[in-house]
Amino acid sequence: MALTQERKREIIEQFKIHENDTGSPEVQVAILTEQINNLNEHLRIHKKDHHSRRGLLKMVGKRRNLLAYLRKKDVARYRELIEKLGLRR
């Protein structure tokens, strides 16, 4: 199921760095994590949906790259983000 505008707004409010922040790595990773979790639930039910599985792998790769960028730029922000999201890294 796609992310609703309301849910996306909630995520942005929770992870934004400053007012009007929609594109910081923290916000992008949080939105991707929510989408990945939703798609994981979908794939548990629909095991043969390989098209969506490929989309999931692309999202995971994009999130990995954003996390690597954030870790390189600011380790403190990176650690805070993975703790908030509950990612095991």
Swiss-Prot record:
Respond yes or no to whether keyword rRNA-binding is given for this record.
yes
Question: Pfam families, alphabetically?
Answer: Ribosomal_S15 (PF00312)
Set out the biological process GO terms recorded for this chain's protein.
translation
Answer yes or no on keyword Ribonucleoprotein: yes
Which Gene3D superfamilies does this chain map to? 6.10.250.3130, S15/NS1, RNA-binding (1.10.287.10)
Subunit structure, briefly?
Part of the 30S ribosomal subunit. Forms a bridge to the 50S subunit in the 70S ribosome, contacting the 23S rRNA.
Q: What is this protein called?
A: Small ribosomal subunit protein uS15
